[in-house]
UniProtKB/Swiss-Prot annotation:
Pfam families linked: UFC1
Residues at the active site: C116 (glycyl thioester intermediate)
Gene Ontology biological-process entries: protein ufmylation; response to endoplasmic reticulum stress; reticulophagy
InterPro entries in the cross-refs: UBQ-conjugating_enzyme/RWD, Ufc1
Protein name (record): Ubiquitin-fold modifier-conjugating enzyme 1
Keyword Transport listed: no
Task of the protein: E2-like enzyme which forms an intermediate with UFM1 via a thioester linkage.
Family: Belongs to the ubiquitin-conjugating enzyme family. UFC1 subfamily.
MF-aspect GO terms: UFM1 conjugating enzyme activity; UFM1 transferase activity
Keywords of the record: Ubl conjugation pathway
Residue ranges crossing the lipid bilayer per the database entry: none
PANTHER family hit by this protein: UBIQUITIN-FOLD MODIFIER-CONJUGATING ENZYME 1
Keyword Ribosomal protein: no
Length: 166
């Protein structure tokens, strides 16, 4: 199910050890620290491989995340705001990543712009609890979703480049 490139990417993202969610007090703070270290490693690896495609930051508690993601299609950069909350049942439940400005533009999305990861990503996440974290959700969830959906939406004229649509 996972190709060689994806395996290589995954192998470079540190696995997490702390099994804690937002209501776990000190354990959550330890998990949040692990999440940040994993994300830093993933972003660093992406930059080294000329594959930089997102920025994320969180509130101080690490329960609300927001940032930007982008993809280049036909030599044009398409940039989107993204957001998600850490579910109470995290890490047993994967975060639901949302791109609000794309809400209603594709069938592979739920209300509020939450991207559909049910078929491919969620079973993989469930098999890897508590070792997968936010970096894994970006690498295995949002990244592939953007790579498939955005070029399709651009080709159909549903998503237009901001500079050329003015």
């Amino acid at each position: 199910m996972v190709d060689a490139h994806t395996r290589k990417t995954l192998a470079a993202i540190p696995l997490l050890r702390v099994n804690a969610g937002p209501r776990s007090g000190d354990l959550w703070r330890a998990r949040h620290k692990e999440e940040l270290m994993s994300l830093i490693t993933y972003v660093k690896n992406n930059k080294e491989n000329d594959n930089d495609w997102f920025r994320l930051e969180s509130n101080p508690e690490g329960t609300r995340w927001f940032g930007k993601c982008w993809i280049v299609v036909d030599m044009l950069k398409y940039e989107f705001d993204l957001e998600f909350d850490i579910p109470v049942a995290y890490p047993s439940t994967a975060p639901e990543i949302a791109i609000p400005e794309l809400d209603g533009k594709t069938a592979k999305m739920y209300r509020g712009g939450k991207i559909c990861l049910t078929d491919h990503f969620k079973p993989l996440w469930a098999r890897n609890v508590p070792h997968f974290g936010i970096a894994h959700a970006m690498a295995l969830g949002l990244g592939p979703w953007l790579a498939v959906e955005i070029p399709d939406l651009v080709s159909k004229g549903i998503v237009k480049h901001k500079e050329t649509s003015s």
